[in-house]
Amino acid sequence: MRLFPRWAEVLGLDARIEGWDIRLGAEAAAYRDTVRRLAGDPGVAGALVTSHKLDVYRHAGSLFDELDRYALLCREVSCISRRDGRLLGQAKDPITAGLAMEDLLGPGRRLDGTTQVLCLGAGGAGTAITVRLLEAEPAPGRIVVADKDTGRLATLREICAELGAGTVELARARGAEDADALLAALPEGSLVINATGMGKDVPGSPLSGRARFPAGALVWDLNYRGDLEFLRQAREQAGARGLELHDGWRYFLHGWSQHIAQVYGLELAPPAFERLAEVAEPLRQPTPARLDAP
């Protein structure tokens, strides 16, 4: 991991990062053993959980002394930290999503009751973004979240009910044609988000080559590396339809920095974050969202 040593130097941390791998979909004992191992090792300050957030919560949630509000709400643990000998589990994705959306919108611009949002993907990232959108004041006028997995949609429905929010429309998108139809129904100026992982975790896009973005749309792909096909589709229409494109680089940076701040008890003011972003920039993959991309 090339980024962490650079940030550790900037933040004055005498620390290194080490990967602990668990097979996807591993048995419950693997997650419980890993959390116990972390809790019992005084040399480990904490952890950032990537692909196993839901399973750590599901199988090892009872091992934590405290789970924060978002961990309980979103049924996931993305950050493990210690305070005064206690093991804490947090879900940082809703906070990360909020910070990234502030960057995306820029100073003085906000989503409001006239804005419509389509989020393709109801996994951890899509759920976090939905939670943040629902907590915004004002919240968007219409939020549509689509996924092919009915289990994910059912979980998100429960989360929305706990928030007392009935404004989210949950749609089963079995394939690209369903996603295209949801996109076609959006008005001008909508926010369109790819939170499926397609374009990074697996190649391709949730949309077909025939998809048509609404004029003036704000297009946000949470991916920052990979084939980024979703962004390439949007860029082909950007000039004619006045699209504004954003990749997931800042979302990634906010995610890592929030986890590091939690583990080491740091306060990251905006200037400190921008310094971290500056140090990270040379590691960034050119994307179709950048004007200087090839």
Please name every model-derived segment.
Residues 110-113, 136-138, 185-187, 207-217, ...:
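Short, conserved loop/helix-junction motifs that constitute active-site signature segments
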Residues 271-294:
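A short, charged, Gly/Pro-tolerant segment at domain boundaries
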